A protein has these predicted regions:
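Glycine-rich anion/phosphate-binding loops
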Residues: 22-31, 61-64, 91-96
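A structural motif
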Residues: 39-42, 107
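Alpha-helix-loop-beta-strand connector modules within alpha/beta enzyme cores
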Residues: 3, 9, 55-82
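Active-site beta-loop-alpha junctions enriched in small/polar residues
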Residues: 10-14, 50-52, 82-87
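Conserved, mostly hydrophobic/aromatic
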Residues: 30, 37, 48, 110
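Hydrophobic faces of well-ordered beta-strands that scaffold small-molecule active sites
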Residues: 7-9, 45-47, 77-83, 108-111
Length: 111
């Protein structure tokens, strides 16, 4: 029997290159791995930015470096970033509001 399946690719987590030299950390590496995952059938990409402690604009800028070209190539992609490490939920999610503003109404960001 056939069942629809939604594949999510969690492409990097918080693993540093010292633990796994193949983990995508830079914007170029995240871009390449995300597009490869989408081409292989993933519907959703989950990726952390380069530094989990970055907040606000700094976190958003890092995501945007990778995700602007990904979403230009694959506007149908579903993407969700991680929350950042912070005391309050407002600070933890501040970068997502910036991303939504920067990327506009066509953004498909899950959370």
């Amino acid at each position: 029997m056939d069942h629809p399946v939604i594949i999510e690719a969690a492409i990097n987590g918080t693993a540093p290159k010292t633990r796994n030299p193949n983990v995508p950390r830079t914007a170029a590496e995240v871009h390449d791995d995300a597009l490869a995952s989408l081409e292989a059938g993933a519907a959703i990409i989950h990726a952390h930015n380069e530094q989990i402690r970055w907040i606000g604009q700094e976190a958003a800028d890092d995501y945007l470096a990778a995700w602007r070209p990904i979403l230009e190539a694959r506007p149908d992609a579903l993407w969700y970033p991680t929350g950042v490490i912070a005391e309050s939920i407002d600070v933890r999610l501040e970068h997502t509001e910036i991303l939504a503003t920067e990327l506009g109404p066509g953004l498909r960001m899950a959370y």
